[in-house]
Amino acid sequence: MALDVLGRLGFFNCGSGSVVTPCSASARLSSELEPSKQRNRSWFRSPGSGGSTWAVANILCFDKDTIPESFRNGRLRSRARQKTLLEGASRSSLSSAARLWISKTAGIPSSRTGCRGSVLNGGWSGGEVAGEGRKSLLPIKRHSSCSSQSLPQQQRRTKDAGRVVCYSHRKRNLGSLLGSRVVEEPWSWILEGYVLKGLTGRRNDGPSELELGRGSYRGGPVHGANHIRPLQRPDSVHPQPLTSARPRRGTEHDELPLRRTLRNCIPHSRDTPPKRDTGIASEKDWGINLKNEKTSESGVNEDGSTWYRESGEDLGDNGYRCRWTVMGGKNADGTSEWKEAWWEKSDWTGYKELGAEKSGKNAQGDTWWETWQEILRQDDWSNLARIEKSAQKQAKSGSGTAGWYEKWWEKYNAKGWSEKGAHKYGRLNDQGWWEKWGEQYDGRGAVLKWTDKWAETDMGTKWGDKWEERFNVGIGTRQGETWHYSATGERWSRTWGEEHFGNGKVHKYGKSTSGESWDSVVEEGTFYQAEPHYGWADAVGNSGQLLSIVALERPPGIYPDLDLGMNKEQQ
């Protein structure tokens, strides 16, 4: 796990003289690392590296022709009092050593440097020792496998060693460094691969070598975590086979130019199943981008896989309009397939809808399906504006022994009322489980929350737990039950309850089938959340694409049929 986290952040070996060498031949991309594992991690111990300690150093690698304007002229133009701790100071060719200014600090992140987690600790093998905040000049040596023939075509023309920039960050964004653009994960800005090679030092029992994976610069952050793994030799790394119907690349070194030329003509597939317990995705996660004209295109990739994409517009009564895009693809033998659809709907009543649906299967027979929707409409009873979000997801293994289904929904209106909930089901071999939960806020202080979970086996054993709470102005109740049924017919249950009077007194009671019982009044404070942590204002702020949908212009003298709205056929 430590190596996975370090692979996303970049690192230096603190126990020995470390050098950074560009090596475009070493490329790996992984998307399994959770963002929550990247936070507040400053120190790790790398297994198999002689017990040396590794410190996190945020690294950005750019090719000469793709360096953003704010990074040019050998200096990082920082704002908001952020400091440059490591910046490229040379554009020499690969045949000569480039140089970096590296800030070496003491053993913990220091407020004097302003760089949280981007620190170097200890002495280098060459005996160079610098105090806290001082800078020392260290060379970047050329790696033996990084000849001009092993570089992508664009870099062969320039023979440039690229640039490396280490910076401090605040709130995990680059907004102060790249103008108004906010990047939630700045560590993913990596163009070319770099190998971090730990030489033998005073605190190393032997040399260790690790590979920093390479992503592709697409004018934005690279998606997916950059994986670090033990490495024997960079030239011994082989590209991993793709299991999807996504168009494949000829060679690893040609990957960057191909992505730049094919990205606009081949649809980017979502050929992986959805993940469980991830709730309702945001507009940004789906990346819906509809075309204004009717199109129909298809193609065959070099590996024999095929793809297609169609776009169009449907019109109906009452100003109904639906703009849509459908795309898909499959591999050469048809064992792997994916489909995806995007749409936006509107009419003269003010109804707006943004949605997406995807499905697929792989060579192992696994299948999946997912749909997502955002809706803006007028409430039928209160005439208030209302935003609704929903998602449904399901996946099933090819063997039929495992599968799951989830339904999520959120509803908000302009007066603070909101409702959220989910239904979940899963099965693995002979065991199945269910979960339902919901919460409702009336916008005036009343709250209802509930949860119901249960599971069972094919042998007849069942167990579960449920609870409910209702509160308003500090007064309310809580009650619940835990139960178990055995395969032999034995039953056990425990029920409990609480009455909160709003004056600091709470009545607690309960009993069980095994003879337990209690009934008492205690002095205890009452806590409950009267307002949702995510409400109407948040829903509006995160629904920019939905709100920007433009309806058809209504002719003069024509008024919307409010009773008709959107009929079932149109929906």
UniProtKB/Swiss-Prot annotation:
Sorted UniProt keywords: Chloroplast, Plastid, Transit peptide
UniProt region (Disordered), positions on chain: 142-162, 215-254
Any GO BP annotation: starch metabolic process
Residue ranges of the TM segments: none
Location in the cell: Plastid, Chloroplast stroma
Regions of compositional bias (Low complexity) in chain numbering: 145-155
Main subcellular location of this protein, as a coarse class: plastid
Purpose: Binds preferentially to highly ordered alpha-glucans, such as starch and crystalline maltodextrins. Involved in the organization of the starch granule matrix, thus influencing starch turnover by modulating the accessibility of starch polymers to modifying and degrading enzymes. Required for the control of starch degradation in leaves and starch distribution in nonphotosynthetic parts. Promotes gravitropic responses, negative in shoots but positive in roots, by facilitating starch granules (statoliths) formation in hypocotyls and roots columella.
Family annotation (PANTHER family): INACTIVE PURPLE ACID PHOSPHATASE-LIKE PROTEIN (PTHR34113), PROTEIN EARLY STARVATION 1, CHLOROPLASTIC (PTHR34113:SF3)
Protein name: Protein EARLY STARVATION 1, chloroplastic
Gene this chain is encoded by: ESV1
